[in-house]
Amino acid sequence: MKIIAVTLREENVPAAFPFEARHYITDDFLRLADRCGVLLLPILSHREPGRLAARCDGLIVTGSNTHIPPWYYGEGPEDQASPADEYCLDRDLILEFAGENKPVLGICAGLQAMNAAFGGTLVRDLPNHDFTDRETHPVTVEPDTFLAGLYGPGIHAFNSFHTQAAGRVAPGFAVTARSAD
């Protein structure tokens, strides 16, 4: 059975309940892992990311309900209010797994974290892009890409609730799909 490391995200807990902090992963990841016959290994610690990368078969960097701070991709000072540990852990894991030539899948903010970890930037705030009032929107899949192999090139409906996006694409990365905005 393959072992896939997966990042967890911290649930927003009121300051009045500091001992109630929780970390989570969405049910979709659990169902998919079950269907694929893989074991998910939840990661919370910065301890020995190199050993972790050597022992696991891949990494999933999940999305987050917080913005990736500008300092993470070299465009601003460190913001004390940002979840630094979360994004530093993402970067450490991404670089270690990539260094081991292990597959890394970034989903939502996880993909944005991958782009930034390898030298790309982000668009900090997408206006009018909190599409919680609809399930999908049109996205154009580029030809001759992995995504085109799954869905075919052209326009497809995908869900997207992002308020940030890749800006400058990291060296060695390629855009596989685009939204009109």
Mark where each language-model region is.
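Conserved G/P- and acidic residue-centered "switch" motifs that form tight phosphate/ATP-binding loops
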Residues: 108
